Design a protein with these regions (language model features):
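Glycine-rich phosphate-binding loops of nucleotide-dependent enzymes
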Residues: 2-241
């Protein structure tokens, strides 16, 4: 089963932000989505999750058509995402914050709290159940955001710069967490990040965007050595060297 974006085109005020981009994310795989600033990475995730309309193309998950669906409908179809800037309910406890996400996917109150406890324990936040989410460190807020995304038991999870702003210790802990998700939960994981060492460690396959178009995709080593990718990041001189 795969999450599939086919020929996705997005325009803003007549300017083409994505130009016929296609990718497939199978369950059980970690796919890295990379590219220079402004290449369209977040726009593609927004298009997949119903945040922005498509000018052309289609989105499907496990054969279920998602084109034109609202963000809530996409989430209920078990496609979850996180954001570059985390979204938190600072006035709720950590447990309540995650349980609220489970409630939004149809769980009852008792089941939602049980699900939240399970996820928080898994993410090393068990002792923080009753703390206000707003008082957590930046790294722990990231963990809570991922826990909230997992509360609906997604088949596909899209992470937008999940390690941005983290120190090395927190980043390493998050890496271990993300690496385990496809095996432990059978989900497909797409990661956007500018940290190439993180991407190369986590992702077996890469998809590269530049100026809204796909310029390379495939095995991480082959993509890293692709002249078009080197040029996009470092300029033509570096690619020709």
């Amino acid at each position: 089963m795969s999450l599939v974006a086919s020929e996705v085109t997005v325009e803003f005020a007549g300017l083409r932000a994505l130009d016929r981009v296609s990718l497939a994310l199978p369950q059980g795989e970690i796919l890295g989505l990379i590219g220079p600033n402004g290449s369209g990475k977040t726009t593609l995730v927004n298009a997949i999750t119903g945040q922005v309309p498509l000018r052309h193309g289609r989105i499907a998950a496990g054969g279920v058509e998602l084109t034109g669906r609202s963000p809530r409908e996409v989430a209920l179809a078990r496609v979850a995402r996180t954001f570059q800037v985390g979204r938190h309910f600072d006035h709720l406890t950590v447990l309540e914050s995650v349980a609220t996400a489970a409630l939004g996917h149809g769980a009852g109150v008792v089941a939602a709290k049980a699900r939240a406890r399970e996820l928080l324990d898994e993410f090393g936040l068990g002792p923080r159940h009753d703390d206000l989410a707003g008082g957590l460190s930046f790294g722990d807020k990231r963990r809570v955001e991922v826990a909230r995304a997992l509360a609906g038991d997604p088949q596909f999870l899209l992470l937008d710069e999940p390690a941005a702003g983290m120190n090395d210790v927190v980043t390493e802990a998050l890496l271990e967490l993300f690496a385990a998700l496809p095996g432990s939960r059978g989900l497909g994981l797409l990661i956007i990040d500018h940290d190439m060492s993180l991407i190369m460690r986590l992702c077996g396959r890469l998809h590269v965007l530049a100026s809204g178009r796909t310029i390379a995709e495939g095995d991480r080593q082959a993509v890293r050595d692709d002249p078009a990718v080197i040029e996009a990041y470092l300029g033509r001189e570096a690619a020709d060297a």
